[in-house]
Amino acid sequence: MRVLGIETSCDETAVAVLDDGKNVVVNFTVSQIEVHQKFGGVVPEVAARHHLKNLPILLKKAFEKVPPETVDVVAATYGPGLIGALLVGLSAAKGLAISLEKPFVGVNHVEAHVQAVFLANPDLKPPLVVLMVSGGHTQLMKVDEDYSMEVLGETLDDSAGEAFDKVARLLGLGYPGGPVIDRVAKKGDPEKYSFPRPMLDDDSYNFSFAGLKTSVLYFLQREKGYKVEDVAASFQKAVVDILVEKTFRLARNLGIRKIAFVGGVAANSMLREEVRKRAERWNYEVFFPPLELCTDNALMVAKAGYEKAKRGMFSPLSLNADPNLNV
């Protein structure tokens, strides 16, 4: 089964073609990072306009390699995300499905990120615990044997990725905050400053990062002579401590020995290092997608579309974009 996947939920325009849920035929992504850097974050209308410009170019490139008539299913993200951005990819996918007379599958963006880890690890089987951690989401999920997903914890305010972006802005490091803090923190001392770990000892599996960000703000207003590298490293350590502790606690309490980390923040080098150290110490299996599958991409959409199509779970062409879609 050949699936065409389209991803336009935020600021990456992506098109991919995947055969039988595992063989990559085409994979194109255009990032808008440089476009949004001058604004210090993603501007929804600007993102949508660039999707309108970039998506036809990527589709043309894809169809130069893959004859359109060989596509069996068209899949696209329909939420969650930015409504204008979502509509660009969703409308294009529906139009292609109609013109090619092929079935259409609407894909949940969060579920697609989870599928990225299965794409990268074909032998991986549930049950497993998944931490979805990105600029828009911080959620702890359980994936059952039937691949159904249940959210057991989530952020009550900012996502971890949002906290990285906001603290990077406070430190004058620019956008996007996750990669730049990761890079700068390598030159700093993560034990230099003690920032709070909100909700770390809370019995729930929920998160809160707004207070941590505010703590950094007050620190910068109060202190003089600090090194940006030390602040970045200490802040990053606080975020990683929270993510690692909550995730392993859920896995331990559920009796599940396999854990996956997905989403843009799953590319963070300190998170990967701390997870692997704890997994080795406590004898857990941990899984990360490769870096290129952590950030938004169309391969994960094609994979999710394949899994739904395989089960006959097609979507009506009346399906609308849902910026607040839940798992």
Curated annotation (Swiss-Prot):
Substrate binds at M132, V133, S134, G135, G136, D165, G178, D182, N268. One of its GO terms (molecular function) is iron ion binding. Its cofactor is Fe(2+). Its main location: cytoplasm. CDD domains: ASKHA_NBD_TsaD_bac. It is found in: Cytoplasm. Keywords: Acyltransferase, Cytoplasm, Iron, Metal-binding, Transferase, tRNA processing. Binds 1 Fe(2+) ion per subunit. GO terms for cellular component: cytoplasm. GO terms for biological process: tRNA threonylcarbamoyladenosine modification. Forms a hexamer composed of two TsaB, TsaD and TsaE trimers. Belongs to the KAE1 / TsaD family. Required for the formation of a threonylcarbamoyl group on adenosine at position 37 (t(6)A37) in tRNAs that read codons beginning with adenine. Is involved in the transfer of the threonylcarbamoyl moiety of threonylcarbamoyl-AMP (TC-AMP) to the N6 group of A37, together with TsaE and TsaB. TsaD likely plays a direct catalytic role in this reaction. This is tRNA N6-adenosine threonylcarbamoyltransferase. It comes from Thermotoga maritima (strain ATCC 43589 / DSM 3109 / JCM 10099 / NBRC 100826 / MSB8).
